[in-house]
Design a protein with these regions (language model features):
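Short, well-ordered coil/turn residues at beta-beta hairpins
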Residues: 10, 73, 85-86, 92, ...
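C-terminal catalytic lobe of FAD-dependent flavoproteins
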Residues: 22, 50, 138-139, 148, ...
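A conserved short coil-to-beta-strand element within the FAD-binding core of flavoproteins
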Residues: 33-38, 71-84
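Rieske [2Fe-2S] iron-sulfur-binding domain
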Residues: 122, 292-369
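Rossmann-like flavin
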Residues: 4-62
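Active-site-proximal alpha-helical segments within enzyme catalytic domains
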Residues: 60-61, 65, 93, 98, ...
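Flavin-dependent oxidoreductases
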Residues: 78-146, 272, 276, 280-286
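A glycine-rich dinucleotide-binding beta-alpha-beta segment and adjacent secondary-structure elements
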Residues: 185-193, 211-214, 272-319
Length: 370
């Protein structure tokens, strides 16, 4: 861990003065600055002084000696105080569900109160050193911070299932604009749960199951949100008072911040099912280029078809096994993604991320070459 300034920068758009006023009213160590000598234009910036930049792997390594971790033991269901795993059943008085997207669907309606977004990162070498950690106030939300000899450039976020196939290209173009002499060392992506009002859900899983607790919806601020969750849930489990518990409670409801997002999420689900049922496939298998995928009609049904770089075709059921929404092709990562709730699958149908609990069914009769 190291201590660095965290800087929220604006190159255009509205002033950050109101952000400063809110920060100061909360007692945050903030001030407006006008940085100079940077490789990109900054009109003004809001600086939060002496923030912790945390590397998660060393942090977890330090925790491991205090924990007992059971690997290869996925939880399949929770009934009352009994947690059913592949290798047996665990009984506990209190249970915390910290599975990224909450796994229990009969409590809490979390699939209606969460959406999932993807974002992308590059690790660059040869970039000039930057002081502090940077976050762009613009729509793209570019972020910059150092990690050892690498400069990490992130951004290009979008709702899962809405990838246009150019996310890495846009990030690389931004890297070229900002740091033309830098070289790309690594590229990867992440997926985050987003709540209706932007505040994590931390607390009771459901009012009908007081022994169940949840932590989710960290909204791309996972290291910060997880520390809040650890503090809040520890207080809750030990009977202590946490002064901000109501703010994070999953049972809260702020109509002005939540109702439009709720209906937006419901609309995605309706459109996802409607597209599968009523919108015909627009692609012929013969037209799918190597390394690409598309939705194809075959023998009266729609399938997701990917053509491998060797020419072999892989066809899978295009219905998400979670709620039946039609999946979309993610050309950047060669995956089938659900725009409704964020489940993802590779081109063979293997499940990559939740909330779906099953893989896609392959179409074994589909011709391997067309």
């Amino acid at each position: 861990m190291c201590i660095r300034d965290s800087i929220y920068a604006a190159s255009d758009g509205p002033s950050l003065t109101r952000e400063l006023e809110y920060a100061l009213s909360l007692g945050a160590p903030a001030r407006l600055v006008k940085p100079e000598g940077l490789p990109f234009p900054v009109r003004e910036a809001l600086c939060f002084e002496r923030q912790a930049q945390l590397s998660p792997l060393p942090f977890l390594a330090a925790l491991l000696p205090e924990l007992t971790v059971y690997e290869h033991s996925p939880v399949r269901d929770i009934r009352g105080h009994r947690v059913r795993c592949d290798g047996g059943t665990v009984t506990a008085e209190q249970i915390v569900v910290a599975t990224h997207f909450p796994m229990l669907e009969r409590f809490g309606l979390y699939d209606l109160r969460l959406r999932q977004e993807r974002s992308y990162l590059l690790a660059l070498t040869g970039a000039p050193p930057l002081p502090g950690m940077w976050l762009d106030a613009g729509e793209e939300g570019w972020s910059l911070r150092r990690s050892g000899r690498y400069l990490l450039l992130g951004g290009g976020g979008h709702r899962c299932g809405e990838n246009l196939g150019d996310s890495y290209d846009r990030l690389r173009a931004q890297a070229q604009r900002l740091f033309p002499a830098a070289q790309e060392a690594f590229a990867w992506s992440s997926q985050d749960c987003m709540t209706l009002d932007g505040v994590p859900y931390i607390g009771p899983y459901s009012s009908s199951a007081p022994f169940l607790h949840v932590a989710t919806g960290f909204g791309k601020w996972g290291m910060t949100g997880s520390m809040v969750a650890a503090t809040l849930l520890t207080a809750r489990l030990t009977g202590e008072n946490y002064p901000y518990a109501d703010i994070f409670s999953p049972q809260r409801f702020f109509p002005s911040a939540s109702i439009s997002a709720f209906w937006e999420g419901a609309g995605y689900a309706v459109r996802g099912i409607g597209r599968r049922l009523f919108v015909p496939a627009q692609t012929a298998a013969a037209d799918i280029a190597r390394g690409h995928g598309g939705i194809v009609a075959w023998q009266g049904k729609k399938y997701g078809v990917y053509r491998h770089t060797d020419g072999t075709l892989f066809a899978v059921d295009i219905r998400c096994p979670h709620r039946g929404c039609e999946l979309t092709w993610n050309d950047d990562e060669k995956s089938w993604d659900c725009p409704c709730h964020g489940s993802r699958f590779d081109y063979t149908g293997h499940r990559l991320s939740e909330p779906a609990k099953a893989a896609l069914k392959p179409c074994k009769d589909f011709p391997q070459e067309i």
